[in-house]
C-alpha cells in the first residue's frame, strides 16, 4: 500500500539522518581533542627500526615512546599479544596506548593472512617493520605492495582488500572514534571463532589503556 511504502521511506530517512548527525558530532568532538601522538611521529619512529628483527625493533620502539610520552604507554607487565580475527584475516596485536580518540599498537602475522580491511570512523596508518603488505583499494583494478620502512594509510570510511606475507610486522596508529573500530575487530568472535577468551583479553587491553589515560589525566605522569 502507498502509505506503507511512504512510512518505510520515512523511517529510512530518519535513520540516515540520525547516522549523519552522529558522524558530524563525532568529527566535531574529534576537533576538540588534544592528541598525544601523530601519524608522522609514529611513522618516523618506526622507520628507524625497519629491517631489524621485529622483536628487537618493537622493544626499542617501546623504550623510545615511553621516553617521549611518559604516562601514555602501558608498562611491560600489562603488554600482551592477542589474536585478532576480522574480515577473514588473522593476526596478532599488542596495545601500547589506547584512548577514546587514539591508539598505538604493534601488529602482524607469523604465517601470512588476507581479507577485508573494514571501514572505520578513524584514520589508521601502518608502518612496516618486516615483511610485505599488499593493498587493493576499492574502485581500482591493481594492488600496491609496501615494504619495510613504508607507511600504509587507511582513511576514514575507506575499504580495501589486504594481504600480509609471512612474518610481516608493523607499528599501527589510529585516530578517530576508536570504540567504533571494536565492532569490526570483535565481530568474528561472535559469528565465527567464538573465542571468548580472546575477546576478554582484547577488552582488558583496551580497558587498561583507558585506565592509564584517566590516571595520567587526573594525577599526572608520575602516578
UniProtKB/Swiss-Prot annotation:
Origin: domain of life: Eukaryota
C-terminal hydrophobic region: annotated segments: 177-223
Subcellular location: Nucleus inner membrane; Nucleus outer membrane; Nucleus envelope; Cytoplasmic vesicle
Region (Targeting to endoplasmic reticulum-associated lipid droplets): 2-8
Residues flagged as site, Important for ligand binding: 126, 172
A single GO molecular function term of this UniProt record: signaling receptor activity
Topological region Lumenal: 1-9
Region (Important for ligand-binding): 99-106
Tissue: Widely expressed with higher expression in liver, brain, kidney and thymus. Expressed throughout the brain with higher expression within cerebral cortex, hippocampus and cerebellum. Within the hippocampus expressed in cornu ammonis pyramidal neurons, the granular cells of the dentate gyrus as well as interneurons. Within the cerebellum, expressed in Purkinje cell bodies. Highly expressed in the brainstem and motor neurons of the spinal cord. Expressed by neural retina, retinal pigment epithelial cells and lens.
Any GO BP: regulation of neuron apoptotic process
Ranges in the topological domain labelled Cytoplasmic: 31-223
Disruption of the gene: reported phenotype: Mice display decreased hypermotility response induced by (+)SKF-10047 challenge and reduced formalin-induced pain. Mice display motor coordination defects, muscle weakness, partial neuromuscular junction innervation, and motor neuron degeneration.
Gene Ontology CC annotation, any one: growth cone
Subunit text: Homotrimer. Interacts with KCNA4. Interacts with KCNA2; cocaine consumption leads to increased interaction. Forms a ternary complex with ANK2 and ITPR3. The complex is disrupted by agonists. Interacts with RNF112 in an oxidative stress-regulated manner.
Function field: Functions in lipid transport from the endoplasmic reticulum and is involved in a wide array of cellular functions probably through regulation of the biogenesis of lipid microdomains at the plasma membrane. Involved in the regulation of different receptors it plays a role in BDNF signaling and EGF signaling. Also regulates ion channels like the potassium channel and could modulate neurotransmitter release. Plays a role in calcium signaling through modulation together with ANK2 of the ITP3R-dependent calcium efflux at the endoplasmic reticulum.
Record's miscellaneous remark: Depletion by RNAi enhances kappa-type opioid receptor-mediated analgesia and prevents the memory-improving effects of (-)- and (+)-pentazocine. Sigma receptors are classified into two subtypes (Sigma-1 and Sigma-2) based on their different pharmacological profile.
Domain remark in the UniProt entry: The C-terminal helices form a flat, hydrophobic surface that is probably tightly associated with the cytosolic surface of the endoplasmic reticulum membrane.
Cited PANTHER family: SIGMA 1-TYPE OPIOID RECEPTOR-RELATED, SIGMA NON-OPIOID INTRACELLULAR RECEPTOR 1
Protein name according to UniProt: Sigma non-opioid intracellular receptor 1
Gene: Sigmar1
